[in-house]
Swiss-Prot record:
<feature type="signal peptide">
    <location>
        <begin position="1"/>
        <end position="19"/>
    </location>
</feature>
<feature type="topological domain" description="Extracellular">
    <location>
        <begin position="20"/>
        <end position="326"/>
    </location>
</feature>
<dbReference type="GO" id="GO:0051092">
    <property type="term" value="P:positive regulation of NF-kappaB transcription factor activity"/>
</dbReference>
<dbReference type="Pfam" id="PF01582">
    <property type="entry name" value="TIR"/>
</dbReference>
<feature type="glycosylation site" description="N-linked (GlcNAc...) asparagine">
    <location>
        <position position="111"/>
    </location>
</feature>
<feature type="active site">
    <location>
        <position position="452"/>
    </location>
</feature>
<dbReference type="GO" id="GO:0045063">
    <property type="term" value="P:T-helper 1 cell differentiation"/>
</dbReference>
<keyword id="KW-1015">Disulfide bond</keyword>
<keyword id="KW-0472">Membrane</keyword>
<dbReference type="InterPro" id="IPR000157">
    <property type="entry name" value="TIR_dom"/>
</dbReference>
<feature type="domain" description="Ig-like C2-type 1">
    <location>
        <begin position="33"/>
        <end position="102"/>
    </location>
</feature>
<dbReference type="GO" id="GO:1901224">
    <property type="term" value="P:positive regulation of non-canonical NF-kappaB signal transduction"/>
</dbReference>
<dbReference type="InterPro" id="IPR015621">
    <property type="entry name" value="IL-1_rcpt_fam"/>
</dbReference>
<feature type="glycosylation site" description="N-linked (GlcNAc...) asparagine">
    <location>
        <position position="107"/>
    </location>
</feature>
<dbReference type="InterPro" id="IPR007110">
    <property type="entry name" value="Ig-like_dom"/>
</dbReference>
<feature type="disulfide bond">
    <location>
        <begin position="234"/>
        <end position="296"/>
    </location>
</feature>
<protein>
    <recommendedName>
        <fullName>Interleukin-18 receptor 1</fullName>
        <ecNumber>3.2.2.6</ecNumber>
    </recommendedName>
</protein>
Length: 537
């Protein structure tokens, strides 16, 4: 007797568990603002009180780190037996969840969908069902998961309430198509929540026989290119057991390069009717495939329909006049734009180089072992008629190049200790400099500066250890005697000083800095000097 009761109890448990079957889904979609719960399949509560089966829950973050959930994690998240409940679920709850009992681990990815304010349901949570016309349409609103908490239930069609009783049982009509939403009102801890389940009902034609028919024109020409692969696609409206096949009207139809793709027959339902498509494949089209009938046929014992395809050589069209004209116009405009860009680059070459030096922080002075960035050669004697030249060399140049741009100049009167051998000292200082700046004037060559000039020219033109920058304080055409070697200097290394070039943004100073070595030293600036380099210090 005890054995029979045990078998009966087991049968009841099997039937009960079957009625509440559990399917594990790794991806779950829910809508924000509704109650939801997670429960692993195949785990039940302990049979005896002395058994321990502690369920632990974890939530993953974007950095794949997991934190354990508890009663303090959120007032909306509760634990009941082996269930993780959300009252309700919100957007911030989206993520990966893991349950663990001993060595048993289950995981889910929870995707929370934002509620559509203009609809009573979310498109991502809609299930679909096809119903044949004049067959039973049965819709019942049930939610066994919250059965004990549901207080009210409503049934909507396309978001309009249609029935006081949440149930439909009738013969389906085409007008019954639509979105049916069951809305359950659930109360929990004094708060009311709504749960929505929506199904999309599509009413289709009955499975009565239709007359088989090929879709589209009865004859179709298809342009092809020799050597290319081609596919012909034929579609038909038919019944489930109708014949549907390709045939070739050709004496030798056993070409292995022409194959009917039997595995890729595609079927679908449209307006309640069954449709299918078949593909005929050609590998590397040749002349033999052209102007031949390839027939697609659908048939049953009552009717037959055929469509013919003919392959013809595709004509390569000439370039339309407007396309040719447009292409030429684009080409001309591109050429003009390129020329303009080149011209602008030539005109603004100095500005572009200085900009590049500034952003790249290039420094050409780090590894050459030299002490000075430039040796300034100028008229040493300050007579009233040469005062402007002298002031320019010993005051203006250092104030701009040293204070504004961070260069280190060698000024003879400032940096040379008196009493040494002048010629040897000058030669040594020029060797330690990266540039030789010559301030050329009418009196320059008649002065002792001639020694500096000869030494610098030797370094520049013979040993190629230094580059010369010539500043014409007096136009060279007004100088009676000019060494031939100076005439060998490239024109861009000859700068002409004008009294109207006080601003540091003037072309003279930009060209001078361009000819100086690139240096990444951040200059020390005085705002007053930035306005006018000729102002008194």
């Amino acid at each position: 007797m005890h054995h029979e009761e045990l078998i009966l109890t087991l049968c009841i448990l099997i039937v009960k568990s079957a009625s509440k079957s559990c399917i594990h889904r790794s991806q779950i979609h829910v809508v924000e603002g509704e109650p939801f719960y997670l429960k692993p399949c195949g785990i039940s509560a302990p049979v005896h009180r002395n058994e321990t089966a502690t369920m632990r829950w974890f939530k993953g973050s974007a950095s794949h780190e997991y934190r354990e959930l508890n009663n303090r994690s959120s007032p909306r998240v509760t634990f009941h037996d082996h269930t993780l409940e959300f009252w309700p679920v919100e957007m911030e709850d989206e993520g990966t969840y893991i349950s663990q009992v001993g060595n048993d681990r289950r995981n889910w990815t929870l995707n929370v969908t934002k509620r559509n304010k203009h609809s009573c349901f979310s498109d991502k949570l809609v299930t679909s069902r096809d119903v044949e016309v004049n067959k039973s349409l049965h819709i019942t609103c049930k939610n066994p998961n919250y059965e004990e908490l549901i207080q009210d239930t409503w049934l909507y069609k396309n978001c309009k309430e249609i029935s006081k009783t949440p149930r439909i049982l009738k013969d389906a009509e085409f007008g019954d198509e639509g979105y049916y939403s069951c809305v359950f009102s659930v109360h929990h801890n004094g708060t009311r929540y709504n749960i929505t389940k929506t199904v999309n009902i599509t009413v289709i034609e009955g499975r009565s026989k239709v007359t088989p028919a090929i879709l589209g024109p009865k004859c179709e020409k298809v342009g092809v290119e020799l050597g290319k692969d081609v596919e012909l696609n034929c579609s038909a409206s038919l019944n489930k057991d109708d014949l549907f096949y390709w045939s070739i009207r050709k004496e030798d139809s056993s070409d292995p390069n022409v194959q009917e793709d039997r595995k890729e027959t595609t079927t679908w339902i449209s307006e309640g009717k069954l449709h299918a498509s078949k593909i005929l494949r050609f590998q590397k089209i040749t002349e033999n495939y052209l102007n031949v009938l390839y027939n697609c046929t659908v048939a049953n014992e009552e009717a037959i329909d055929t469509k013919s395809f003919v392959l013809v050589r595709k004509e390569i069209p000439d370039i339309p006049g407007h396309v040719f004209t447009g292409g030429v116009t684009v080409l001309v405009l591109a050429s003009v734009a390129a020329v303009c860009i080149v011209i602008l680059c030539v005109i603004y070459k100095v500005d572009l180089v200085l900009f590049y030096r500034r952003i790249a922080e290039r420094d050409e002075t780090l590894t050459d072992g030299k002490t000075y960035d430039a040796f300034v050669s100028y008229l040493k004697e300050c007579h009233p008629e040469n005062k402007e030249e002298y002031t320019f060399a010993v005051e203006t140049l250092p104030r701009v190049l040293e204070k504004q741009f961070g260069y280190k100049l060698c000024i003879f009167e400032r940096d040379v200790v008196p009493g040494g051998a002048v010629v040897e000292e000058i030669h040594s200082l020029i060797e330690k400099s990266r540039r030789l700046i010559i301030v050329l004037s009418q009196s320059y060559l008649t002065n002792g500066a001639r020694r500096e000039l000869e030494s610098g020219l030797h370094e520049a033109l013979v040993e190629r250890k230094i580059k010369i920058i010539l500043i014409e304080f007096t136009p060279a055409s007004n100088i009676t005697f000019l060494p031939p070697s100076l005439k060998l200097l490239k024109s861009y290394r000859v700068l002409k000083w004008r009294a109207d070039s006080p601003s540091m943004n003037s072309r003279f100073w930009k060209n001078l800095v361009y000819l100086m070595p690139a240096k990444a030293v951040k200059p020390w600036r005085e705002e007053s000097e930035a306005r006018s380099v000729l102002s008194a210090p």
